[in-house]
């Protein structure tokens, strides 16, 4: 299986640079991979695709303002750090620029010196382990000094930070938003719940691997980065009950899918409370164990996310759906439109 098998033509004008004024006014392409049908609608009609007794599973991770601009304390050279994941205490794995000038022992200062960092370890591809020092609460310092880590294909300034968070974001820890969830409003979720759909939350902290292009020709050789996930006992029990009563598990986004399928693989197709690190790579040939349907945004050509969607619905059909989306001027990527796959 070659990476080029998942390529498609995408005009740059279709890459959404800003979110729509109303979250749920985005377009929704409903695709049925068994009937091979496609239907154009709007996101607030996703409620029509959900049945009483289903579970809608969402990732409640919250994006950190994880991009920090500072300077080396000796040379005053500009430094940019992107927080990837918390290792322990005040130690973080970061992506550093310019990495070659940041050796072990280098000191960095941010803002007015309220936040400082020292390089503890050098990793591959510009990665570093840093230890922060500060007064007060780290997340509060980060909120005041950090910027939202928007994807590299978004060039417009984000006017409202909250638009790169889901309305149900709660657990701090992501370097990127679980973008399929950006379309939901509190009002729409209330209507969905009133229909008899169970709203269930899990956590997966999205790492930067989500934007990293596949750099190998052979799909099998691609290595996924590990991300932390968690499913609570209460959430697991709700999902078990839904399955037992014949309801569907409907995942919101690829991060929810990857969490649920990680758990399904670990517990022989069953749903159990669990937490840990996952680097699951779902590609054609994979047999889904938990997820029955899902919503997701439109992804980059040749990305692992297109491969995941193709694993569920078939590569040829998904590429047909993407061609339809391009022809109909759907908006792509993080601030773009969505598809519902069943």
From Swiss-Prot:
Catalytic activity, reaction form: 7-aminomethyl-7-carbaguanosine(34) in tRNA + S-adenosyl-L-methionine = epoxyqueuosine(34) in tRNA + adenine + L-methionine + 2 H(+)
Location in the cell: Cytoplasm
UniProt cross-references to SUPFAM superfamilies, sorted A to Z: QueA-like
Entry GO CC: cytoplasm
Domain of life: Bacteria
Predominant location: cytoplasm
Alphabetical keyword list: Cytoplasm, Queuosine biosynthesis, S-adenosyl-L-methionine, Transferase
Broad EC category: transferase
Keyword RNA-binding: no
GO molecular function: S-adenosylmethionine:tRNA ribosyltransferase-isomerase activity
Record Gene3D superfamilies: QueA-like
GO biological process: queuosine biosynthetic process; tRNA wobble guanine modification
Enzyme Commission identifier(s): 2.4.99.17
Pathway: tRNA modification; tRNA-queuosine biosynthesis
Function, as annotated: Transfers and isomerizes the ribose moiety from AdoMet to the 7-aminomethyl group of 7-deazaguanine (preQ1-tRNA) to give epoxyqueuosine (oQ-tRNA).
Oligomeric form and interacting partners: Monomer.
Record-stated family: Belongs to the QueA family.
Protein name: S-adenosylmethionine:tRNA ribosyltransferase-isomerase
Taxon lineage: Bacteria, Bacillati, Bacillota, Bacilli, Lactobacillales
């Amino acid at each position: 299986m070659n990476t080029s098998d998942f390529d498609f033509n995408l005009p740059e004008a279709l890459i959404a640079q800003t979110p729509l004024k109303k979250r749920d006014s985005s377009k929704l392409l409903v695709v049925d991979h068994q009937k091979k049908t496609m239907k154009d609608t709007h996101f607030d009609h996703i409620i029509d695709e959900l049945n009483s007794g289903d579970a809608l599973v969402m990732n409640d991770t919250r994006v950190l303002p994880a991009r920090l601009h500072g300077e080396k304390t000796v040379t005053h050279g500009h430094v940019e750090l992107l927080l990837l994941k918390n290792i322990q205490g005040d130690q973080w794995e970061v992506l550093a620029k310019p990495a070659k000038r940041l050796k072990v022992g280098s000191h960095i200062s941010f803002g007015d010196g309220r936040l400082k960092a020292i390089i503890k370890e050098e990793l591959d591809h510009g990665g570093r382990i840093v230890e922060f020092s500060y007064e007060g609460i780290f997340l509060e310092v980060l909120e005041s000094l950090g910027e939202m880590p928007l994807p590299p294909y978004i060039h417009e300034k984000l006017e409202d930070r909250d638009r790169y968070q889901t309305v149900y974001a709660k657990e701090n820890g992501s370097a990127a938003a679980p973008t399929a969830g950006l379309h939901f409003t509190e009002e729409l979720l209330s209507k969905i719940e009133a229909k008899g759909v169970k709203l269930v939350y899990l956590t997966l902290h999205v790492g930067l691997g989500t934007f990293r292009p596949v750099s190998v020709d052979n799909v099998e050789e691609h290595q996924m980065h590990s991300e932390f996930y968690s499913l609570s006992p209460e959430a697991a029990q709700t999902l078990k009950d839904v399955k037992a009563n014949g309801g569907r598990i409907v995942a919101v986004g690829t991060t929810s899918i990857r969490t649920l399928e990680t758990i399904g693989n670990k517990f022989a197709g069953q749903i159990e409370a669990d937490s840990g690190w996952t680097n699951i790579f779902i590609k054609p040939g994979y047999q889904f164990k938990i997820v029955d349907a899902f919503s997701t945004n439109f992804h980059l050509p040749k990305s692992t996310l297109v491969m995941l969607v193709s694993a569920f619905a078939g590569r040829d059909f998904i590429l047909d759906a993407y061609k339809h989306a391009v022809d109909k001027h759907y908006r792509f990527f993080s601030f773009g439109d969505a598809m519902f796959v069943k």
